[in-house]
Amino acid sequence: MRVQRLISLVLLLALLGLFVGDVHRQALASDTSGGSSDGVIWSGVQVGTPPTSGSSGGSSCTWTLMVTYDANIGHTTNISRVVDGIRYDLYERRCGSTYSSIWIPRLAPSQVARSAALLVQGRLPAPSASFAPTPSSMVVKSPVWFWIDPSWWTPVSATAWIPTVFGPLWARTTATPVKLTFFTQDDGTSTGGDLGFADCIGPGWQWDVTLGDEANSPCMYTFRHASTSRPSGSFVGVIGVEWRISWTSSTGAGGTLPSYTTSAFVVNRVAELQALVG
């Protein structure tokens, strides 16, 4: 009983982790407009297509670094301040006849890339896998194919940028699906603790009747036990997709960021066929 409760707790924590992670990512990704204080806007990283030149911020907007005269050094200097260890410069943004003063953080390309990564993660879809046999008609010791529609298996990108005196500094972050995983309960008693796992590179292969029963797939799992012993009569599993995160920037710098996984729960009913003796 303790093992069963532990398995249920692990699956529940996984679901909560996915939910909280999605809310957290959406909150961070939507925080690109910042806030305002004393009539001045505090801005985060800008989202979308960057300007094509140092002064253009779209078809009718311009960004200008604001300066002030410093008597101590005898010439003008840009207006800046440090908040939580990050230095912000004050820019004037003009769009037609309207303008606003906006504090823009000084960030390295990798920091802008991480902001874009938050946007990408918020856009990644939860996987929807197919199974053969179907989840309601699986059989012990009979291989199960699982796969993702190839049209779903495509990269997802986002671009973030900040204005600088040298023109916009942008970073483009791309998440590329690389691995499909399947984790499931697979125990023979109502209190057992056996678990099953399989993974493969790529989206897997779609099963077709013309392939026959002896064909193999890189994405395949074979249940060892029937699910009839479970109180619900089924096994709970998780299908996941691992995404590789990479980025490029306007400076030529680029690299990779920690991979990310999207997941979804699946329910499988596994029967055990009894041989007939004549």
For each feature predicted by the language model, list its residue ranges.
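Extracellular/lumenal mature domains of secreted and surface-exposed proteins
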Residues: 24-278
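N-terminal export and membrane-targeting signals
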Residues: 1-12, 26
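Bacterial N-terminal signal peptides
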Residues: 9-21
